[in-house]
């Protein structure tokens, strides 16, 4: 974390930092460029979750905190041995250290999704009895990154197919409504930039892999389960 962030050729950290910096200065967040001239792709919930780290002066610290939370979850739900093994595997992983060095938040996002899924499994939270609550959670998770909902799709995909059409419709509407509510403040702020801008977060998140590919992957994972 002592590496000069401006010397990095990865701009995920500045996509968050500059978003929040612009927001607190009254400038439209999704119009703020990264230090490499790009634009931020994370959705609002993920940006807002980084406010404490922004206040501390380093949004890259989120990977440290979420990793510790992930290991604590494994220790609490499984055993200290499981947490230790996973911790060792992370420590010997070049990809993990790369994520830390460049202050990336992608693995952090996925670990947080895994933490949520692990607790839902541990608490035996069934979709049929918790349609509204789980839909709200999925909607908020969707407002981090599109790929972040894959663990929840795998977890609840089969149960969703067992619901009647009314509950299925309610579930999807609540997800869409929750996600929309997180986006609306930025639509009202400067909707043309968010919705019709060439580099809006919807475009950036699907540019390297279409939404159809994501949907096929999620459906395939559900089928396997």
Residue map of PLM features:
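Perimembrane helix-loop-helix junctions
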Residues: 151-176
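Membrane-interface alpha helices of multi-pass inner-membrane proteins
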Residues: 51, 94-95, 130-157, 181
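Membrane-lumen/periplasm interface segments of specific transmembrane helices
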Residues: 167-225
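Aromatic- and kink-enriched transmembrane "portal" helix at the membrane-lumen/periplasm boundary
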Residues: 47-49, 87-111
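Intramembrane catalytic core of multi-pass membrane enzymes that act on lipidic substrates
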Residues: 2-59
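Specific aromatic-rich, kink-prone transmembrane helix
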Residues: 108-125
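Transmembrane-helix motifs of polytopic, lipid-linked glycan transferases
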Residues: 59-84, 94-95
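Transmembrane alpha-helix/helix-exit interface in multi-pass inner-membrane proteins
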Residues: 2-8, 151, 157, 179-192
């Amino acid at each position: 974390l002592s590496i000069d962030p401006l010397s990095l050729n990865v701009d995920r950290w500045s996509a968050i930092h500059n978003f929040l910096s612009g927001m607190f200065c009254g400038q439209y967040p999704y119009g703020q460029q990264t230090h490499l001239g790009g634009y931020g792709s994370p959705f609002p919930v993920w940006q807002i979750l980084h406010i404490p780290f922004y206040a501390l002066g380093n949004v890259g610290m989120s990977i440290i905190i979420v990793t510790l939370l992930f290991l604590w979850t494994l220790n609490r739900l499984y055993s200290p041995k499981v947490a230790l093994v996973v911790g060792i595997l992370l420590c010997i992983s070049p990809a993990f250290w790369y994520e830390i060095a460049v202050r990336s938040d992608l693995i952090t996002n996925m670990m947080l999704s895994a933490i949520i899924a692990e607790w839902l499994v541990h608490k035996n939270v069934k979709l049929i009895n918790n349609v509204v609550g789980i839909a709200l959670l999925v909607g908020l998770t969707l407002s981090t990154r599109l790929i972040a909902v894959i663990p929840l799709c795998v977890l609840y995909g089969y149960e969703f197919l067992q619901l009647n059409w009314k509950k299925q419709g309610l579930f999807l509407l609540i997800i869409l409504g929750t996600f929309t509510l997180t986006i609306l403040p930025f639509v009202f702020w400067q909707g043309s930039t968010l919705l019709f801008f060439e580099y809006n977060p919807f475009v950036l998140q699907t540019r390297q892999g279409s939404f159809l590919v994501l949907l096929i992957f999620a459906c395939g994972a559900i089928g396997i389960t």
